[in-house]
């Protein structure tokens, strides 16, 4: 403690390896890391004014499992990415327009190819994103197979594409 404020603390696994550490970086920012029993980083959380703003979770092999970054003043995320143990993506969500809370979203096949992609918009009434515009769907080889047009988060129309259309 320094002047009544927690500055640093550490917890340890039963075998003596570091399990968790917290550091106050300054009066506003702090950082917490947790570790797997094998010593690999498990998670890292960055705080601003006591609120988690960035979080990264790791598999025990060291690969990133999940990464998120929250908007500092709005109730939505700027980024949410999910990965497989081999490091290949499962899904990604990245803000492309903060003013309209619009995101580029993609989902991936186990082989790493894009399964579908399109845009989504944060809906404050649902406290979640919903798909908007045209979404493209791909087969495992990466060929675009069909498109869906979304209106208010619901499929409005489906457009099949030719089997050989890239």
Language model regions located:
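Glycine/tyrosine- and acidic-biased, solvent-exposed loop/turn segments at the edges of beta-strands
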Residues: 1-166
């Amino acid at each position: 403690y320094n002047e009544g404020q927690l500055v640093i603390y550490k917890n340890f696994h039963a075998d003596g390896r570091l399990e968790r550490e917290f550091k106050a970086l300054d009066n506003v920012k702090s950082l917490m890391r947790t570790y797997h029993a094998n010593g690999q980083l498990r998670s890292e959380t960055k705080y601003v004014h006591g609120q988690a703003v960035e979080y990264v979770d790791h598999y025990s092999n060291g690969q990133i499992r999940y990464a998120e970054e929250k908007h500092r003043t709005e109730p939505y995320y700027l980024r949410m990415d999910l990965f497989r143990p081999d490091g290949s993506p499962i899904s990604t969500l990245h803000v492309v327009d903060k003013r309209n809370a619009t995101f580029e979203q993609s989902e991936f096949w186990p082989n790493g190819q894009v399964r579908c992609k399109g845009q989504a918009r944060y809906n404050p009434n649902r406290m979640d994103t919903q798909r908007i515009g045209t979404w493209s769907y791909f087969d495992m080889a990466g060929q675009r197979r069909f498109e869906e047009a979304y209106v208010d988060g619901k499929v409005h129309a489906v457009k099949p594409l030719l089997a050989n259309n890239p």
